[in-house]
Amino acid sequence: MSTITLLCIALAGVIMLLLLVIKAKVQPFVALLLVSLLVALAAGIPAGEVGKVMIAGMGGVLGSVTIIIGLGAMLGRMIEHSGGAESLANYFSRKLGDTRTIAALTLAAFFLGIPVFFDVGFIILAPIIYGFAKVAKISPLKFGLPVAGIMLTVHVAVPPHPGPVAAAGLLHADIGWLTIIGIAISIPVGIVGYFAAKIINKRQYAMSVEVLEQMQLAPASEEGATKLSDKINPPGVALVTSLIVIPIAIIMAGTVSATLMPPSHPLLGTLQLIGSPMVALMIALVLAFWLLALRRGWSLQHTSDIMGSALPTAAVVILVTGAGGVFGKVLVESGVGKALANMLQMIDLPLLPAAFIISLALRASQGSATVAILTTGGLLSEAVMGLNPIQCVLVTLAACFGGLGASHINDSGFWIVTKYLGLSVADGLKTWTVLTTILGFTGFLITWCVWLVI
């Protein structure tokens, strides 16, 4: 099948999905699965393999996020029902004011994003975003959009995240220099993203019922409702902060140990197990069960009801995120990404813009930032021969920032952000997609300026 035909099929799939979700109001989970099936058949994937590809796409995404979303949702619900999120938000709002609180939370997200994967970190911070927004009486999007933007920037551009690490190997870039330059460029990119998010947030966007309930702006279900007595004596700032910092610190310890300790070290396996996001969140949830619930007089049944009330909302996020993974997997298996990359490679572009444009096109066409970055690295691995070490790093970063832009409906991260922030698909495209594209182009332009200077 020709490249043009594959690209037309992929484009038609995206348009059909948007029409189904935005115009026909079809539930995104169903729409994603239906369009994935039709695109797979149209792209020539054998009928007997279509089901396997769709299951692999669902499993590939949910294998990494289901447990994290479930545990993170229960931890967040415990913190929220105890009054801890509002307690923390009130403290920082008094100290900093609303505007500086948004900036401070964005700065904290920058440092959190270095050792912690984007989806894990965002899920951990979600209850804090809700708490701050509730106290400030503003949309959680005003906090969540810059936070998610800076965390994704760090995720695609700074080791030890998989995209930049693997691309560095393919493009012969030094990991140390990549870390230093990646962080240095991510700082001004984050500043631009912060102000871009402020401009985007000047418009009011409707929130989903689930987020309205979380913000206590709509009647909650009986089992999810917060008893007034639960918040009479809310936990202190130090306790709430500890419950958020502990899983992050544990994950950081696992990441650092994998980097610094030799593979033969007897403690490495144990530290990596404890430092996995799943185990770190389980530890934090057990601590919350004791410190926020039992020690404060909640009954076992009441505690169980509160934890269980987090799961219906989490299930929606999980299913839609998994369906987004199915759509992305179908696009990858159809060969649209490889065909597009080969076509772009034939165009005589300078090396740095080529790395960015190929990666951005791959990101837009098949959804995964990591796949876009790795594919670009493989295509340009021979082209970087003869470059000096810093130039190799800059080519790597150009590919990374290409993978940052154009997050939309074929990206599982798009569904995580929009569902947690209560956005419709149309509003997600107007906010999150626009912001990631601004961040990607900003990162590339700064990288190109450095290239011209050296």
Question: What residues fall within each predicted segment?
Answer:
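Alpha-helical transmembrane segments of multi-pass membrane proteins
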Residues: 98-113, 137-156, 174-183, 187, ...
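Long, contiguous bundles of hydrophobic transmembrane helices that form the permeation core
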Residues: 2-4, 180-305
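Hydrophobic core segments of alpha-helical transmembrane domains in multi-pass membrane transport
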Residues: 7-21, 33-41, 69-74, 108-112, ...
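Structural signature of hydrophobic alpha-helical transmembrane segments
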Residues: 1-10, 62-68, 117-121, 184-186, ...
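Membrane-embedded alpha-helical segments and adjacent helix-loop junctions characteristic
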Residues: 47-135, 297-385
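Hydrophobic transmembrane alpha-helices of multi-pass solute/ion transporters
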Residues: 1-74, 87, 91, 95, ...
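Juxtamembrane helix-boundary/capping and inter-helix hinge elements in multi-pass membrane proteins
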Residues: 43-45, 80-85, 95-99, 132-143, ...
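Juxtamembrane and boundary regions of transmembrane helices in multi-pass small-molecule transporters
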Residues: 177-226, 401-454
